[in-house]
Amino acid sequence: MAVISKVTYSLYDQKEINATDIIISHIKNDDDIGTVKDGRLGAMDGALCKTCGKTELECFGHWGKVSIYKTHIVKPEFISEIIRLLNHICIHCGLLRSREPYSDDINLKELSVHALRRLKDKILSKKKSCWNSECMQPYQKITFSKKKVCFVNKLDDINVPNSLIYQKLISIHEKFWPLLEIHQYPANLFYTDYFPIPPLIIRPAISFWIDSIPKETNELTYLLGMIVKNCNLNADEQVIQKAVIEYDDIKIISNNTTSINLSYITSGKNNMIRSYIVARRKDQTARSVIGPSTSITVNEVGMPTYIRNTLTEKIFVNAFTVDKVKQLLASNQVKFYFNKRLNQLTRIRQGKFIKNKIHLLPGDWVEVAVQEYTSIIFGRQPSLHRYNVIASSIRATEGDTIKISPGIANSQNADFDGDEEWMILEQNPKAVVEQSILMYPTTLLKHDIHGAPVYGSIQDEIVAAYSLFRIQDLCLDEVLNILGKYGREFDPKGKCKFSGKDIYTYLIGEKINYPGLLKDGEIIANDVDSNFVVAMRHLSLAGLLSDHKSNVEGINFIIKSSYVFKRYLSIYGFGVTFKDLRPNSTFTNKLEAINVEKIELIKEAYAKYLKDVRDGKIVPLSKALEADYLESMLSNLTNLNIREIEEHMRQTLIDDPDNNLLKMAKAGYKVNPTELMYILGTYGQQRIDGEPAETRVLGRVLPYYLPDSKDPEGRGYILNSLTKGLTGSQYYFSMLVARSQSTDIVCETSRTGTLARKIIKKMEDMVVDGYGQVVIGNTLIKYAANYTKILGSVCKPVDLIYPDESMTWYLEISALWNKIKQGFVYSQKQKLAKKTLAPFNFLVFVKPTTEDNAIKVKDLYDMIHNVIDDVREKYFFTVSNIDFMEYIFLTHLNPSRIRITKETAITIFEKFYEKLNYTLGGGTPIGIISAQVLSEKFTQQALSSFHTTEKSGAVKQKLGFNEFNNLTNLSKNKTEIITLVSDDISKLQSVKINFEFVCLGELNPDITLRKETDRYVVDIIVNRLYIKRAEITELVVEYMIERFISFSVIVKEWGMETFIEDEDNIRFTIYLNFVEPEELNLSKFMMVLPGAANKGKISKFKIPISDYTGYNDFNQTKKLNKMTVELMNLKELGSFDLENVNVYPGVWNTYDIFGIEAARGYLCEAMLNTYGEGFDYLYQPCDLLASLLCASYEPESVNKFKFGAASTLKRATFGDNKALLNAALHKKSEPINDNSSCHFFSKVPNIGTGYYKYFIDLGLLMRMERKLSDKISSQKIKEIEETEDF
């Protein structure tokens, strides 16, 4: 099949519809001939096509037609286009509406775009009547009536026949088409002689069962039958038009219907493009429950017998395979034989006669049951990233379940509690070769962004790794027994006694070094914990090995170590019993006694406070502050439990060093003090969305407690531990949380999946070009992919070493730091980066040496400097800043830290060039990789408990999925959270006083009303402590009351006095007369007074000012004050003195003030912050997404393709069902370059692996060279001028 490079969309014209000779004229008929189910319309359900004689797979269907007897039927989706054109012509004479007469000798094709636009404004008039002297009729507005199902004159609702509209539109001369934006013959908007009947292939039957009898129906076939029926009856135009609209898109005439029609099956989640083209059901697939197997390696997958006997693989007949095929036929192993000459597939069964069908010529193939070691793709859904779908070698295993190695369970998010996986056996030999390289676990070992291995030990293996390292005094036989099948090459080197460390050295098998961890392949750390053996850890031994050599060595270590750990467990055993957790009841009894005592003290103190408030001895705290104090007391109780448990663990380790539970804790597998607290101490406060359960009827959650009870246990504090067991009420509270969490998980899975799909659609066409830049089509997004132009899985986070006077080259390092430090002090100066990105893991090549053998200090500096200068020019074209790389090499290879030989230095920089040259290739789909990593992480996060940054009633800057969703949707006209930071608290206080919402009711006033002879008197007594607590003054309270009364329309006359009652209280007395009806208005006034007398912006949030330590540099901190406030616009801050106050606005305010580049920076950091701590490695994908959203002049939402030239097919697969209609209407022509279009037309997309194909635009290189030479020459001239001036 030829490669399609361009596609043009247009509407079928009537000649094409008339050209088919399959006439449909019956509603029902024997054998369905002449009906809408006619066998000539294509092959269906195993029957051959009666037109071309081909099968379902080969026949694309044939169109039929039904006569509509010269009736003019409008194509329903283009009704709005016809109305648009009618608004530009006179319905009476057919001439264009114009302000003045126009001549027909204008050549519109010669006009420029601007001239054409001016002419449009001039001609397309808004006048009331026609300029044509022979017509002079008033212009009529034509609309489409849903009720009558035809065009009508809006003025008098009289029908306008379709034939009249047809005549007027086709009479518009072709030369005026550009003026009206007509792209093809207007007759194509109508059906005239015949209506087309689509092939059977686009209307597959929907099966359902009634009384266990299968029925088949198809809504489209029924609707087409109705059109044929009406045409046969020669029905009125409106009747046929209605039938056509019901078939095409019923929503045009009826809003509240969900019946299936053409529009329905081409839009929404289950549209035909997504269901049948982008992805569809396949054969040669299997699905089963998964289980673990200890006998298979990471690169293998165990397949049960019944799947192996069902799936078949092809063997093509050629000179190399013909003998093997004959053997298979002779041994009766062939299931199918395909004869290419006869185009015939034969099923081979016992006793079946197959004479003269088998020729075994090149091109034929046989299908046999799938064999061991064949590559098969398998995966677990949901497939959140590419490690969920991999291709491994098949191994025969017993039982009925698919078996996987436990080492890959983490990467597939699989556990063995009934999870299922699917598998597909690809038939095309090219596909098999491709998958066996690109999807092989060895290829995928390291995470695309994080750089750590995605495979590693799980569960018991982690404990085995810890215990094995600590074992001592092993004889050779014991070592060989532990090593099992890998022990044959073990060299004792004359030793009689061995330790676990020796076994690790043998397993590592390379002379590898890593600071503080490895020396010449020997582990120098104190213990081997989970960080060394599990997946997604930078200290993983498998990762360090693959950084040092290749992924093959990394995978080999995982396979060998996993085998050895399992053997260790089977020999020495490991088990945890309840006795390990709780040898006796002494400790739990002690903890319980402490908890009961403390909770009683808390209750007592709280009850005393409530009594004193009731008796008027003290002024109550605000509700938020009261809840905070209670929460902090309960938190102290929780912390006390954790401290007691930590001490207990420490003591147990001294008394019983072989306690298996504590071994697990030390190994970093399960059981931390918090988990132990739930089991042994107290189950703690139950929260829903981060808050204790809300009180309901009678001021309580459950009827176990008294009405309006303030008991902490009545709000979900569970005192019992799980060992003791929960009481009824405690169980209800724990289930209350479980209910809300399970609801959240169901809803969040759907929401995160939707956003993930949008982000992937948005980013899928973002690839790396031949120069290591990130592009979409011809648009440059980033100068340097991954900042290093090296594959993301090769880059490595390393410690950021700050300048120190003890360092060699201190001045140079310090100068570099001053240039780059802004990037490492972030999040409003609250955080200082601890890690930075190294271009590759060069630390595994750093081998310490003595002072005598070390490279000279100056030589090393010159080498680093020369390499960076060379890389800057040759690889980054001096366009990108790579100072961070120079800083890393200068600090990590600093002679004050470590001395290395010249050979080591040369090795490091040779490896550096190797990574630059060979890892990141043209076509690397960096967009999809980044989108998947972001999506996978926010999905995980949305399903775990959410967290926020602020407490105490302030506006919460939410972390997690919700905030990420808001940032990517980029909704306008919403309030934004503005942060103000200053070292001068008074500047923030003036903003706070003006903006913070305080109403009279919050000050707990004592309001009394009395009536005097000619007026009402209202006394408001307020305790001054409340005024102070609200951080306002008595004058502000007076102003609040005064302002409310003066603006009140129900007050006729008023006066006000302020009195100081005593040292604690102040009284505001108001004298009032109301407008009629006086009683009613008095009631209204008294009802709204506590809330309506207020100041500030109405908001449920307070505006507290908090202080924090801000970083100016790694060694310079400053006390700063911070305040967050919700504002619509920064103009509201215009009247304040904000000199030396840092204002951090939201994304739209940032864009409005500082422009698109600042908005990009803001979006990147804001998206990264939603992930919380420990996700710094997501900076690169966040930056890439932010750069894409801000690639044009204005930030663009992930929901839209407003700026990018997104293809019609991309829009259609994204869910825009109007995309194809608009493309056809405007006769669009588009190249097939993007992912969606390539998928649709079976073209290989221009994305690759970075292994084989480079796309280099030589023109770009020449332009770049010219620019660089111009830049260098102008620099030289400047230098000469400066020298002359000197």
UniProtKB/Swiss-Prot annotation:
Listed GO molecular functions? DNA binding; DNA-directed RNA polymerase activity
Q: Which domain of life is it from?
A: Viruses
Q: Where in the cell is it found?
A: Virion
EC number(s)?
2.7.7.6
- Pfam families from the entry? RNA_pol_Rpb1_1 (PF04997), RNA_pol_Rpb1_2 (PF00623), RNA_pol_Rpb1_3 (PF04983), RNA_pol_Rpb1_4 (PF05000), RNA_pol_Rpb1_5 (PF04998)
For biological process, the GO terms are:
DNA-templated transcription
Disulphide bonds annotated for this chain are none
Does the keyword Nucleotidyltransferase belong to this entry? yes
Query: In its keyword annotation, does this UniProt entry include Zinc?
Result: no
Q: Which InterPro entries match?
A: DNA-dir_RpoC_beta_prime (IPR045867), RNA_pol_asu (IPR000722), RNA_pol_N (IPR006592), RNA_pol_Rpb1_1 (IPR007080), RNA_pol_Rpb1_3 (IPR007066), RNA_pol_Rpb1_4 (IPR007083), RNA_pol_Rpb1_5 (IPR007081), RNA_pol_Rpb1_clamp_domain (IPR044893)
Q: Which UniProt keywords are listed? A: DNA-directed RNA polymerase, Nucleotidyltransferase, Transcription, Transferase, Virion
What is this enzyme's catalytic activity, as reactions? RNA(n) + a ribonucleoside 5'-triphosphate = RNA(n+1) + diphosphate
* GO CC aspect terms: DNA-directed RNA polymerase complex; virion component
Q: What class of enzyme is it?
A: transferase
The record's family statement is: Belongs to the poxviridae DNA-directed RNA polymerase 147 kDa subunit family.
Which PANTHER family does the record cross-reference, listed alphabetically? DNA-DIRECTED RNA POLYMERASE, DNA-DIRECTED RNA POLYMERASE III SUBUNIT RPC1
Q: According to its UniProt entry, what is the function of this protein?
A: Part of the DNA-dependent RNA polymerase which catalyzes the transcription of viral DNA into RNA using the four ribonucleoside triphosphates as substrates. Responsible for the transcription of early, intermediate and late genes. DNA-dependent RNA polymerase associates with the early transcription factor (ETF), itself composed of OPG118 and OPG133, thereby allowing the early genes transcription. Late transcription, and probably also intermediate transcription, require newly synthesized RNA polymerase.
Assembly and partners are described as:
The DNA-dependent RNA polymerase used for intermediate and late genes expression consists of eight subunits Rpo30/OPG66, Rpo7/OPG90, Rpo22/OPG103, Rpo147/OPG105, Rpo18/OPG119, Rpo19/OPG131, Rpo132/OPG151 and Rpo35/OPG156. The same holoenzyme, with the addition of the transcription-specificity factor OPG109, is used for early gene expression.
Q: Under what name is this protein listed?
A: DNA-directed RNA polymerase 147 kDa polypeptide
Its taxonomic placement starts with:
Viruses, Varidnaviria, Bamfordvirae, Nucleocytoviricota, Pokkesviricetes
Write the gene name.
OPG105
